[in-house]
Design a protein with these regions (language model features):
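N-terminal beta-alpha lobe that positions the nucleotide/phosphoryl donor
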Residues: 2, 6-181
């Protein structure tokens, strides 16, 4: 299921001093509720996480278009729910670390190399050749370190509220539409 936010919403965002107008927020909430009903999940549910991806789209391919953000909705509690739901703690924490990295890079404009360096350092310390050679505890450590990078660069903790994450990602899409390549 997909939910589309049209270019008119972007125009409204810029006409409202780079704030998403209440009317658009209500439309987002309504579309989320409809998607929740279809999927049988609730956005922000910590035990049965409903994760979304956010990407910019255009009718034609555009160079420099922002990267997709996957696993939006994960946080320190939802990751535990995902681990329990999938019976795979490593998968859950790997998904969370990927989300933190994508969100930090694409939405918050923190240099992705900072995250890659941390992952490479941990792999080297563990004698791991590939990310897949790291276990669940290693992924938890990567998440901890990634959140520290976020804190050091943004002066605040990584956002734990899925709705806050979603709105920030939507604003990043709007910013990407206003970027000259």
């Amino acid at each position: 299921r997909q939910m589309c936010i049209r270019d008119r919403a972007c125009t409204a965002y810029y006409n409202n001093n780079k704030q998403i107008p209440a009317e658009i927020l209500e439309q987002i909430d309504a579309a989320l509720a409809q998607t929740e009903e279809i999927c049988g999940k609730k956005f922000g549910d910590m035990e049965n996480p409903f994760l979304v991806s956010v990407r910019s789209g255009a009718r034609v391919s555009m160079p420099g278009m922002m990267d997709t953000i996957l696993n939006l909705g994960l946080n320190d509690i939802a990751v535990q729910g995902l681990a329990k739901l999938t019976d795979n703690e490593r998968f859950a924490y790997d998904s969370y670390r990927r989300f933190i990295q994508m969100f930090s890079d694409v939405v918050m404009e923190i240099d992705r190399k900072k995250f890659e360096d941390v992952l490479d350092q941990l792999k080297e310390a563990k004698g791991a050749r590939f990310d897949t050679d790291l276990d669940a505890d290693d992924m938890k450590e990567v998440v901890r370190r990634f959140k520290q990078i976020y804190l050091e660069n943004k002066g605040e903790e990584f956002p734990q509220d899925p709705k806050t994450q979603l709105i920030a990602a939507i604003k990043a899409v709007f910013r990407s539409w206003d970027t000259v390549s």
